[in-house]
Amino acid sequence: MATPSMMPQWAYMHIAGQDASGYLSPGLVQFARATDTYFSMGNKFRNPTVAPTHDVTTDRSQRLMLRFVPVDREDNTYSYKVRYTLAVGDNRVLDMASTFFDIRGVLDRGPSFKPYSGTAYNSLAPKGAPNTSQWIVTTNGDNAVTTTTNTFGIASMKGGNITKEGLQIGKDITTTEGEEKPIYADKTYQPEPQVGEESWTDTDGTNEKFGGRALKPATNMKPCYGSFARPTNIKGGQAKNRKVKPTTEGGVETEEPDIDMEFFDGRDAVAGALAPEIVLYTENVNLETPDSHVVYKPETSNNSHANLGQQAMPNRPNYIGFRDNFVGLMYYNSTGNMGVLAGQASQLNAVVDLQDRNTELSYQLLLDSLGDRTRYFSMWNQAVDSYDPDVRIIENHGIEDELPNYCFPLNGIGPGHTYQGIKVKTDDTNGWEKDANVAPANEITIGNNLAMEINIQANLWRSFLYSNVALYLPDVYKYTPPNITLPTNTNTYEYMNGRVVSPSLVDSYINIGARWSLDPMDNVNPFNHHRNAGLRYRSMLLGNGRYVPFHIQVPQKFFAVKNLLLLPGSYTYEWNFRKDVNMVLQSSLGNDLRTDGATISFTSINLYATFFPMAHNTASTLEAMLRNDTNDQSFNDYLSAANMLYPIPANATNIPISIPSRNWAAFRGWSFTRLKTKETPSLGSGFDPYFVYSGSIPYLDGTFYLNHTFKKVAIMFDSSVSWPGNDRLLSPNEFEIKRTVDGEGYNVAQCNMTKDWFLVQMLANYNIGYQGFYIPEGYKDRMYSFFRNFQPMSRQVVDEVNYTDYKAVTLPYQHNNSGFVGYLAPTMRQGEPYPANYPYPLIGTTAVKSVTQKKFLCDRTMWRIPFSSNFMSMGALTDLGQNMLYANSAHALDMTFEVDPMDEPTLLYLLFEVFDVVRVHQPHRGVIEAVYLRTPFSAGNATT
């Protein structure tokens, strides 16, 4: 929202402009100019980096920042309260705008924290490749039950010989001359899994011996992808220990590594000629999968031949960090946890709470008007929530794969045949004989060299779509894999992580050639995503581990306090800080962090504050002038709005709203959007037990994304005045936001938004009214404004009515890339190459009949309808100022919103843009008085 249109009508009080110079009376302005040569006040009276050049009597006046330690603290289950005594000495002025809370504590982000995609363990392994493993097969014979141990895997380390001592890996030639003592593998860590043949060349024809390691049947099988077992010795060995019973009676039980050797010979070897070719060192290890899970499991967890084919998938990334600008950390708008700023002489609290003020959102929009939110500022944790536009709106322009991509075997040829050398017989020119000068075994390949083709571009694009779009589809589109048990609580990380989705829902051929967002994804919060760059940055500021000793600096946001000049006296300043991890922390998956084990504790909260580095006589003059009630400090809330939440039941389409009769003086208009009930906490309570969510909170941080669900809004005052005038495209008193069927051509920009609504938004945001369409100036087009976030889209789909050969083939019966992809699952490819039966071609000579679909998205911003007294002038838009009908009488207001149905309860978030100001008066030492004025909704004060 652009700054100028966001500010109230200044004429109501003695405020003249947007910077703090407008807060001052002419006398104070004159004083500032007179002292400007040796102390520049600048905006908001402060320039704390410039020290005075003369008249300074103490070194304390030069000190820029002081630390206040709390005089009292309360550490409760859900909150942490601190109280400070601010002693402002004579001839000093404390700048509240420079204060911040310096907080130290310990954060446990819980087991659901995973700050990266993929796995850190064996990430190059195929998803379905097992570790070298063993399993037991039980056979019921006629007379007895037999059990056999089966092994699958690889022995990679070459040795000189295999004896009962194991694999010989070398010789000790330092013994007596002529003797060579064999060196055998140290079974605690050898053969090492990372050691094998150094080259592909092995054509000498000798029968080598090999050794390797294998997991015993007692260690449950897991795919190699994601497998980790902690080392149990400094050489990297991983075997567990096993108990060894004493050999003598009364002896002590000991432990040894749980490692055994198993020897293997070729299957064709016969008794009497058996000799070991392979030895496997089998062991039990502490096998775990810290960052992956199984998505294909043919049987139960017991080891079996079928379970060799288990398939792994990495756990979903879940960044967890403090919210943007520490949203949610400090209590605002909460009756039971209201802050206090009171003079100790009067004990009047200058912080008056109004439930319908939104301090956090106001601060977000204020920052956006001041600077570039895309530039991060780590001190205040300023890294705005964002999303990858390519994920929200998919521009599927296909893949550039004109040339095939090959991969080749390591020797560049592939497996060959073994040939012996021959030559022409010397006595017979037509015969052949063995050539003794040529080796008897020559490996030669015929024909072209072996190659495999992989479409790298297609695989990258398909993988991007699955990881970034398909996995974030609503849960109704997902399923739980067979033989996998997930918790019943759908808000937990384990549940969200374990659910999988068919890649066919979001494949590379879906909407190919179109710029379109998936319809089921439109109502999914796009900021709850691992590509939320701001959240990722804030998460990484804390580090990459679960347990964090944090040290943060948090600013005060309440508009009546944050810019105050505190005059000499003694004051009580206290505030509450939340300990609810769902409110304080943000996760990219939005899981319930309370259930998933995250905790936060504070060890200290100190206050840092700055005194103006003024000369004493300058400060005393400033104090004398500010004590005068004509020089009260006035501040207005940037948003200057009363916010109201109206529930919208699931599948409802109409929301009527009534505001009782009142005088609408100083009213500036409406802003509105839609929120999900699940994503909106109750700010009035100290702890909301029903808030089981930790993603972005649009109500507080401005991550709105449901604006496209509004269809119409009708506004009627009881005076029955058709206030918007009669020169608009549509009927007065009704704004049509989008039209599905547009026979008259009222829509704009190749989408279903009406020209009427587009112009109203341009007018409300940039003052670009009915005089045409043009791009707003850069300084007005901020991150939260309309034009930057307006995204029109259109696509063609098959005309199911007029295309006579159309068949509605459902997802299980569609095939495309058959034989090269898994069937309805992110698992091993299956099937056979065959012509695709989906989608129908929309281009070329065989293009089928199609219809055009249009829509738009407009995230982050709020829809705005400006209001002026001129609208009450019976339809004529004039510049004659306030109409008497409007200014001197009260009116009731009825509004009706028409919205798209959603299958979950939502809220209409409606801002009445009013005049929200506080005047702070400090007549005597230790006395602070505040008067809040907000017409036409409410007012309050701290003077009685």
Curated annotation (Swiss-Prot):
GO terms for cellular component: host cell; host cell nucleus; T=25 icosahedral viral capsid. The modification Phosphotyrosine is found at residue 932. All late proteins expressed from the major late promoter are produced by alternative splicing and alternative polyadenylation of the same gene giving rise to non-overlapping ORFs. A leader sequence is present in the N-terminus of all these mRNAs and is recognized by the viral shutoff protein to provide expression although conventional translation via ribosome scanning from the cap has been shut off in the host cell. GO terms for molecular function: structural molecule activity. Major capsid protein that self-associates to form 240 hexon trimers, each in the shape of a hexagon, building most of the pseudo T=25 capsid. Assembled into trimeric units with the help of the chaperone shutoff protein. Transported by pre-protein VI to the nucleus where it associates with other structural proteins to form an empty capsid. Might be involved, through its interaction with host dyneins, in the intracellular microtubule-dependent transport of incoming viral capsid to the nucleus. It is found in: Virion; Host nucleus. Belongs to the adenoviridae hexon protein family. It comes from the Viruses. HAMAP family: ADV_CAPSH. The record marks 769 as: Involved in interaction with pre-protein VI. Its main location: virion. The lineage of its organism: Viruses, Varidnaviria, Bamfordvirae, Preplasmiviricota, Tectiliviricetes. InterPro entries: Adenovirus_Pll_hexon_C, Adenovirus_Pll_hexon_N, Adenovirus_Pll_hexon_sub2, Adenovirus_Pll_hexon_sub3, ADV_hexon, VP_dsDNA_II. Homotrimer. Interacts with the capsid vertex protein; this interaction binds the peripentonal hexons to the neighboring penton base. Interacts with the hexon-linking protein; this interaction tethers the hexons surrounding the penton to those situated in the central plate of the facet. Interacts with the hexon-interlacing protein; this interaction lashes the hexons together. Interacts with host dyneins DYNC1LI1 and DYNC1I2; this interaction might be involved in intracellular microtubule-dependent transport of incoming viral capsid. SUPFAM superfamilies: Group II dsDNA viruses VP. Gene3D superfamilies: Adenovirus Type 2 Hexon, domain 4, Hexon Major Viral Coat Protein, domain 2, Hexon Major Viral Coat Protein, domain 3. GO terms for biological process: microtubule-dependent intracellular transport of viral material towards nucleus; symbiont entry into host cell. This is Hexon protein. The modification N-acetylalanine is found at residue 2. It comes from Human adenovirus B serotype 3 (HAdV-3). Keywords: Acetylation, Capsid protein, Cytoplasmic inwards viral transport, Host nucleus, Host-virus interaction, Late protein, Microtubular inwards viral transport, Phosphoprotein, T=25 icosahedral capsid protein, Virion, Virus entry into host cell. Residues 193-216, 229-253 are annotated as: Disordered. Induction: Expressed in the late phase of the viral replicative cycle.
